[in-house]
Amino acid sequence: MEWSLTQNKLLAFHRLMRTDKPIGALLLLWPTLWALWVATPGVPQLWILAVFVAGVWLMRAAGCVVNDYADRKFDGHVKRTANRPLPSGAVTEKEARALFVVLVLISFLLVLTLNTMTILLSIAALALAWVYPFMKRYTHLPQVVLGAAFGWSIPMAFAAVSESVPLSCWLMFLANILWAVAYDTQYAMVDRDDDVKIGIKSTAILFGQYDKLIIGILQIGVLALMAIIGELNGLGWGYYWSILVAGALFVYQQKLIANREREACFKAFMNNNYVGLVLFLGLAMSYWHF
């Protein structure tokens, strides 16, 4: 196979990896930083931090590639995705597969600089990243798999720091799954009508008229679990204030999705970046005694 790395091809790879849309990487980054700050506590080693930040961006890019590869026959039928690089022909299937392999190999080379437990956990991370895009064909709960995939950096972070995965690790992992199901349901509400027509499954379709209620319950669960983590680790008031601010952001999201309008649902999804940021700032302030 010969690659013609013209400017147009590089731009197509750029779009395929979603490096022009950082929201997905940020939603993966914040829980990773939560885990590193709790595990250390508050002062992660610079190399470990660098490996995980780079890994977040690389694996998110790889996840986007495999997601579009899995959906290549569906995306052409959805208005929002019809012009993506694979359905439009800007990137071939062989090129997409090769790009995925390159991104995964670079990520794995970074992980090899960490301890054995983290390396072993990274195998599960790869499996989750590969499996998730295909789940929407077989189950209405692909968002749960997404949450596990996006949250697997949490046990990896704890393992990298202490070679252990304590209770706080798994509570944070569960909180991330609940959060991911909530925000990705908001995202799926944007495409719900198109997904029904082409046979794609999602929690937005499964929850139906109860979507807003269930999202709200999931968001309350996130806040409760994060509060328990704070109690287990003796975190200060700065952290609990961040939980209150995150709760206010969740209320704002409920207001946005009230009428289930596409643009408003997408705006609610995007707002979750601030939830992750606020919780991270709360952790940082607590550990750094601001």
From Swiss-Prot:
Residues 44-45, 120-140, 184-212, 255-267 are cytoplasmic. The keyword tRNA processing does not apply. Optimum pH is 7.8. Its EC number is 2.5.1.39. It comes from the Bacteria. Pathway: Cofactor biosynthesis; ubiquinone biosynthesis. GO terms for cellular component: plasma membrane. InterPro entries: HB_polyprenyltransferase-like (IPR006370), Prenyltransferase (IPR039653), UbiA_prenyltransferase (IPR000537), UbiA_prenylTrfase_CS (IPR030470), UbiA_sf (IPR044878). GO terms for molecular function: 4-hydroxybenzoate polyprenyltransferase activity; transferase activity, transferring alkyl or aryl (other than methyl) groups. Its cofactor is Mg(2+). It is a multi-pass membrane protein. Keywords: Cell inner membrane, Cell membrane, Magnesium, Membrane, Transferase, Transmembrane, Transmembrane helix, Ubiquinone biosynthesis. The keyword DNA repair does not apply. Can also use Mn(2+) and Co(2+) with lower efficiency. The chain crosses the membrane at residues 23-43, 46-66, 100-119, 141-161, 163-183, 213-233, 234-254, 268-288. GO terms for biological process: ubiquinone biosynthetic process. Pfam families: UbiA. Catalyzes the prenylation of para-hydroxybenzoate (PHB) with an all-trans polyprenyl group. Mediates the second step in the final reaction sequence of ubiquinone-8 (UQ-8) biosynthesis, which is the condensation of the polyisoprenoid side chain with PHB, generating the first membrane-bound Q intermediate 3-octaprenyl-4-hydroxybenzoate. Geranyldiphosphate (GPP), all-trans-farnesyldiphosphate (FPP) and all-trans-solanesyldiphosphate (SPP) are also accepted as side chain precursors. Belongs to the UbiA prenyltransferase family. NCBIfam families: ubiA_proteo. This is 4-hydroxybenzoate octaprenyltransferase. It comes from Escherichia coli (strain K12). The gene is ubiA.
